[in-house]
From Swiss-Prot:
This is Alpha N-terminal protein methyltransferase 1. Alpha-N-methyltransferase that methylates the N-terminus of target proteins containing the N-terminal motif [Ala/Pro/Ser]-Pro-Lys when the initiator Met is cleaved. Specifically catalyzes mono-, di- or tri-methylation of exposed alpha-amino group of Ala or Ser residue in the [Ala/Ser]-Pro-Lys motif and mono- or di-methylation of Pro in the Pro-Pro-Lys motif. Probably required for the synthesis of neurotransmitter melatonin from serotonin, which plays a role in promoting a sleep-like state, called lethargus, during larval development. Expressed in uterine cells and PVT neurons of the tail. Expressed in pharynx, intestine and DVB tail neuron. Coiled coil: none annotated. It comes from Caenorhabditis elegans.
């Protein structure tokens, strides 16, 4: 989430291993989940709620039955964003200790569904289960090929009319940047748009996060639908 200084290409498995090590060491609280930027929590959740409400008004997904939180950690987004909207929420994270901590952070709530402990590079959401798949501040850990493959698997996880939302930092530099601390890339918007196209996803809505400090790279939200649904870009 922070600034980075490199655009080097890395071996995927090496990056995944080091990223998992980084998050395994993170403090198991909101500050840890936000990389030391706890003050981002309130404006982040507020903007995300507005984005979901906007998607509803545009009829970009039909129901609020089932959502999936990818890179859920202790459940910050699950608890404060998805549970207020959806009847059931599944969680995914590569670090088992963080998923386990969610029992304390959220509590034993009947609206929490399955908890998947697996990296996104191999994770396949259950097919045709979700009205919304939310992917926040985690896509930068995937190399390009794995990101596209993951998006394709997410599309299969959607119910008819379902929607994927990607929320992540976007660099204004000409090339992506690599963060040597958490081992993630901050991609350019053209790179993200190419990944959407390669995944046969249409971008049906997008928004810029507001209220963040200037030293944070811009954060954007993209709503995506499989191309066969017939929606066009907004």
């Amino acid at each position: 989430m922070s600034s980075s200084s490199s655009s080097r290409i890395h071996n995927g498995e090496d990056v995944y291993e080091k990223a998992e090590e980084y998050w395994s060491r993170a403090s198991q609280d909101v500050n840890g989940m936000l990389g030391g930027f706890e003050a981002l929590h309130a404006p982040d959740i507020s903007a995300s709620k507005r984005f979901i409400e906007g998607l509803k008004k545009k009829n970009l997904f039909g129901y609020f039955d089932y959502a999936l939180d990818c890179g859920a950690g202790i459940g910050r987004v699950t608890k404060h964003l998805l549970m207020p909207f959806f009847s059931k929420v599944d969680m995914e994270d590569v670090v088992e200790e963080l998923i386990t901590k969610s029992d304390q952070y959220i509590g034993k709530h009947p609206r929490i569904g399955d908890k998947f402990v697996e990296g996104l590079q191999t994770f396949a959401p259950p097919e045709r289960r979700y009205d919304l798949i939310w992917i926040q501040w985690v896509s930068g850990h995937l190399v390009d090929e794995d990101l596209v493959d993951f998006f394709k698997r997410c599309a299969k996880g959607l119910k008819p009319g379902g929607c994927i939302v990607l929320k992540d930092n976007v660099t204004n530099h000409e090339k992506r940047l690599f963060d040597d601390d958490d081992h993630s890339w901050t991609r350019t918007e053209p790179e993200l748009l190419k990944a959407f196209a390669d995944s046969q996803l249409d971008m049906v809505s997008k928004a810029l996060q507001t209220g963040f400090p200037k030293e944070i790279y811009p954060v954007k939200m993209y709503a995506l639908k499989p191309q066969h649904t017939g929606f066009t870009n907004n």
